[in-house]
A protein has these predicted regions:
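Binding-site signature for planar aromatic cofactors or substrates
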Residues: 1-253
C-alpha cells in the first residue's frame, strides 16, 4: 500500500504519481548510496556503488570481495539503496527514493549483458574473479519527491510484472543494439522532446514492459510508456508511436 506521510497537496496542475516517480528514479539510477550494517561493530555503513535494474526493477549491484560492504552483507544481508535525481541548486529539492530489503547472490554471467548496457565502463573488471553480483530483494521503498510528497511505496506496487514478458527480455539486447546502430535519431528525440533533456548523442540502454532507459555521458533517464508492452513487436510499435508524438510536439512548438 502507498502511504502519504504529509498532508500538503502537490503543486496545482501537476498530478503526482508516487509509484511512477519512484520507478523512474530506480530505473534511471546508475550510482547510489548503499547502506549496510558494519560487520565489526554493527554501526550503519554507507558506500557509493554503481547499480542497474533487474528485469522487475530490483537493484543489481556489482561488488568486489575486497569491499567493506561485501563483508558487511556476508554477515548481515539487510541493506538499503538510496537513488537520487541530481540537479542544480538545493539537493533536497530533487526527488530521491530509498529501497530496503536483503541482498542475495545472483549469477553474474546471466546478468552481464544487462549490466554492461547500463554500466559500460565496468567492462574492464566485470569478469574479475573477485567481483560478484548481488540483487537487493526489496521489502519496501520510501520516496521523497518534494514538499508534501513524502510517501512509502510497497514493493508489490513498485515492481514490474515480468511473467508475460519473457519474449521481450529475450529480445532486449537485440533491441538495444538495433536502436543504437540504426535509430539513434529516434533516441535523441525521445530524450529531448519527450523528456526535455539537453541535446546530445543519447543512447538506448534498455527496455522493460513499462518503459525504456536512455543514457548520455553517465546520466540516464527513464521514459515511461503510455501502455504496457510484452514483446519485441510491441516495443517496435511503441517506439514508432513515440517518434510520432515527439515530432508532433516539435512541430507544435
Amino acid at each position: 500500500m502507498t502511504t502519504a506521510k504529509l498532508d500538503a497537496a502537490p503543486a496545482a496542475g501537476r498530478e503526482f504519481d508516487p509509484v511512477a516517480t519512484a520507478r523512474s528514479l530506480l530505473r534511471a539510477a546508475r550510482r547510489a548510496s548503499l547502506a549496510t550494517l558494519d560487520r565489526a561493530g554493527g554501526q550503519p555503513y554507507v558506500s557509493l556503488i554503481g547499480i542497474a535494474s533487474d528485469e522487475d526493477g530490483a537493484p543489481l549491484l556489482l561488488v568486489s570481495n575486497l569491499a567493506r560492504h561485501a563483508a558487511n552483507i556476508a554477515g548481515d544481508a539487510r541493506a538499503s539503496v538510496l537513488a537520487a535525481e541530481i540537479g542544480a541548486g538545493d539537493p533536497l529539492a530533487h526527488p530521491r527514493v530509498t529501497l530496503f530489503g536483503r541482498c542475495t547472490a545472483v549469477d553474474k554471467s546471466a546478468k552481464k549483458a544487462r549490466w554492461l548496457a547500463r554500466q559500460p565502463d565496468s567492462a574492464m573488471y566485470f569478469d574479475f574473479a573477485d567481483f560478484h553480483m548481488l540483487r537487493l530483494e526489496p521489502e519496501g521503498a520510501h520516496l521523497v519527491a518534494g514538499f508534501g510528497r513524502i510517501v512509502d511505496v510497497a514493493w508489490n506496487e513498485l515492481r514490474t510484472e515480468t511473467v508475460d514478458a519473457a519474449a521481450l527480455f529475450g529480445a532486449e539486447p537485440g533491441i538495444v543494439a538495433h536502436m543504437n546502430e540504426d535509430h539513434d535519431d529516434a533516441t535523441r528525440l525521445y530524450a529531448t522532446r519527450l523528456l526535455g533533456a539537453p541535446d546530445g548523442d543519447w543512447r538506448f540502454e534498455g527496455v522493460d514492459p513499462l518503459g525504456c532507459e536512455l543514457g548520455l555521458d553517465g546520466r540516464s533517464l527513464y521514459l515511461p510508456f503510455p501502455e504496457r508492452v510484452t514483446s519485441a513487436a510491441d516495443v517496435r510499435r511503441m517506439l514508432v508511436r513515440l517518434v510520432g508524438e515527439a515530432k508532433a510536439g516539435d512541430a507544435a512548438g
